[in-house]
């Protein structure tokens, strides 16, 4: 399973390497860590 880094767009299930999938700039991106 691949994951997305901070600043990359994510899906509602939140496949982020670290941090969480949050709404920003009218889209979902990975933020935090």
Curated annotation (Swiss-Prot):
Q: In which tissues is it expressed?
A: Expressed by the venom gland.
Which Cys pairs are S-S linked?
A: 3-17, 10-21, 16-30
What's any one GO cellular component for it? extracellular region
Main location (coarse class): secreted
Q: Give the matching InterPro entries.
A: Toxin_29
- What's in the domain note? The presence of a 'disulfide through disulfide knot' structurally defines this protein as a knottin.
Q: Which family does it belong to?
A: Belongs to the neurotoxin 17 (21C2) family.
- Which purpose does this protein serve, as stated in its record? Acts as a neurotoxin.
Protein name per Swiss-Prot or TrEMBL: U13-ctenitoxin-Pn1c
């Amino acid at each position: 399973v691949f994951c997305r880094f901070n600043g990359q767009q994510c899906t509602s299930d939140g496949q982020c390497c670290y941090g969480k999938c949050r709404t920003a700039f009218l889209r979902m991106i990975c933020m935090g860590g």
